[in-house]
């Protein structure tokens, strides 16, 4: 299969189940909301080494938020319900409560269950906290130096999908990077998904474990390193490829991840110099979801 002359390899992305939350962060201005959303989703690229996977889903205009202010929906994900509960409390408490003019609301419509994050955080008010109702939502109002911080009492979580992915192979590092950025921009329009790596782009693909060091849980994927293509016997890098980037996607469900992969691949294939699109998997032995690239189109 080809798209705009770019080979789409007949392979699949192997994705995994993960617990997902969606949190709406509002503030007095779009800029302030973006700052808080960015802070709360930091250090959230992969649960290989981070305490959560997190990213910004989408912007929400004032006319669509409970308090009539601009906001951003973020997603925070973790395989463990207990760990996700902890991460929500920590990231909202340290990344959003501390940010100027912010408020926080649940943004997950079809939750499997709810966690009482706002109820727990209200105790920061040290007895001065109050209970309100906004747009039919139970809200805790916590007095802070600049006014009151508002947070919804409960936040929904559900079973989502993590690790949807594809590799972009270009004739140069520059072409592959431009295509990766185009892919991330396209995926940003797919609601219910995030690309949790820096700028949405993975530069250092990894494999499980190590060939040499027993103490490592993960190490560089030498088969996908362009500078090793003449050194590694079973390299997966074509001779004319000199730049590779990976896009990893987390979503509220498989359908959202599939749509994001499709739109991202289509966008990547519009960039000159892109030679091939592939995907990462573990032979189908680890992940519950096997997303075939050809089936996306």
UniProtKB/Swiss-Prot annotation:
Localization (cell): Cytoplasm
The pathway it acts in is: One-carbon metabolism; methanogenesis from CO(2); 5,10-methenyl-5,6,7,8-tetrahydromethanopterin from CO(2): step 2/3
Enzyme Commission number, as recorded: 2.3.1.101
Q: Which GO terms describe its molecular function?
A: formylmethanofuran-tetrahydromethanopterin N-formyltransferase activity
What the entry lists under SUPFAM superfamilies is as follows:
Formylmethanofuran:tetrahydromethanopterin formyltransferase
Question: Which reaction is this enzyme known to catalyze?
Answer: N-formylmethanofuran + 5,6,7,8-tetrahydromethanopterin + H(+) = N(5)-formyl-5,6,7,8-tetrahydromethanopterin + methanofuran
Residues spanning the signal sequence: none
Q: Which UniProt keywords apply?
A: Acyltransferase, Cytoplasm, Methanogenesis, One-carbon metabolism, Transferase
Q: Which InterPro entries match?
A: ForMFR_H4MPT_ForTrfase (IPR014053), ForMFR_H4MPT_ForTrfase_C (IPR002770), ForMFR_H4MPT_ForTrfase_fd-like (IPR023447), ForMFR_H4MPT_ForTrfase_N (IPR022667)
Which parts form a coiled-coil structure per UniProt?
none
Name under which the protein is recorded: Formylmethanofuran--tetrahydromethanopterin formyltransferase
């Amino acid at each position: 299969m080809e798209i705009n002359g770019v080979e789409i390899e007949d392979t699949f992305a192997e994705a995994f189940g993960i617990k997902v939350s969606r949190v709406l962060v509002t503030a007095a201005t779009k800029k302030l909301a973006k700052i808080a959303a960015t802070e709360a989703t930091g250090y959230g690229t992969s649960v290989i080494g981070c305490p959560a996977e997190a990213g910004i889903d989408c912007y929400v205009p004032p006319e669509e938020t409970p308090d009539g202010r601009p906001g951003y929906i973020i997603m925070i994900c973790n395989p463990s319900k207990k760990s996700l509960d902890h991460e929500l409390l920590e990231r909202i408490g340290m990344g959003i409560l501390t940010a100027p003019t912010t408020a926080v609301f649940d943004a997950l419509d079809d939750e499997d269950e709810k966690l009482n994050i706002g109820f727990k955080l209200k105790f920061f008010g040290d007895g001065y906290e109050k209970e309100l109702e906004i747009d039919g939502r139970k809200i805790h109002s916590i007095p802070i130096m600049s006014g009151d911080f508002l947070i919804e009492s409960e936040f929904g979580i559900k079973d989502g999908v993590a690790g949807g992915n594809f590799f972009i192979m270009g004739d140069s590092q520059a072409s592959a990077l431009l295509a990766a950025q185009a892919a991330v921009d396209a995926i940003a329009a797919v609601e219910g998904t995030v690309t949790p790596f820096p700028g949405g782009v993975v530069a250092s693909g990894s494999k499980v474990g190590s060939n040499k060091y027993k103490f490592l849980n993960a190490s560089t994927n030498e088969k996908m390193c362009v500078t090793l293509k003449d050194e590694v016997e079973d390299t997966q890098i074509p001779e004319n490829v000199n730049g590779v980037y990976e896009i990893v996607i987390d979503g509220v469900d498989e359908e959202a991840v599939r749509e994001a992969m499709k739109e991202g691949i289509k966008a990547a294939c519009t960039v000159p110099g892109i030679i091939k699109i592939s995907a990462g998997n573990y032979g189908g032995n680890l992940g519950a979801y096997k997303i075939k690239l050809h089936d996306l189109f």
